[in-house]
Amino acid sequence: MKYTIKKLVFIITTVFLSIALAGCSTKTPTSQEAIDKYTEALKNIKSETYYSDVTVKDTIRNKENTYKFNINGTIVDNPLAMNVNIKIDDTALSLYMKNSNSLYVKQNSLSWRKYKSSSETLERFDSANKMSRDKENIDFLKSNANDFNVEEQGDNYVLTYSGSDTKYKDFLISSFIGFGEMSEFNRYDLKNITIKQTIKKSSFEPVELNITSELTYKYDSSVKSYIEIKTTTSNINLGKVAQPDDLKVTNNL
């Protein structure tokens, strides 16, 4: 009898423990499920703050040159508004736009200059901003979701692709924020690329994108380019575009 009761208690305890563990566990989504939810989250982003570092190392005739770029700021969609800072080597550029009306530009320590926001200017800035670039990738990611691995890291999921499929060169190009003409990439072949997109478990919103890639020049394989991109995203749908402190808007500016 004691044995039977002891066995029964053990079975009941095991059942309750199994239920408790099942209730506490979270199933890791497949890469397709994660990317579907991630791309849906992208569609709902109306404002955000971002910080992007780009490092390019070119090797030409065994000589290596390194270039560093940084672009950071806050952007709001519809109507387009932004406060963006760009640094390329020793050149600093600041851009401010509010309600798609006028664009203000400041280079290094010079004074702000006002430019009328033509439809062409708006189209150019709209296509080059981070939210537009992210949304450009939606169909591509959904179509190629099975190429990615997904793993849990704390409060996040990390989607990873590593390979050399040439179609990922387009993803690399669209991950450059704030850069206009990218036709120079047509002269290069993709040798390898690793993409790591970190997203929140709770909302599937972007946290950080890391890309490392190597390209070779089509007409001379000894010419190589190593590119590293790291972009973090925060303040999603909380970001507000504030007028720069040193910009005094008057009738003449």
What would you call each of these model-derived segments?
Residues 53-61, 87-91, 108-110, 214-218:
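Hydrophobic lipid-interacting interfaces of membrane-associated proteins
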Residues 157-249:
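Gly/Pro-enriched, hydrophobic low-complexity segments
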Residues 37-42, 70-77, 97-103, 194-202, ...:
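Extended lipid/amphipathic-ligand handling interfaces
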Residues 108-176:
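Flexible, processing/modification-adjacent segments and terminal tails
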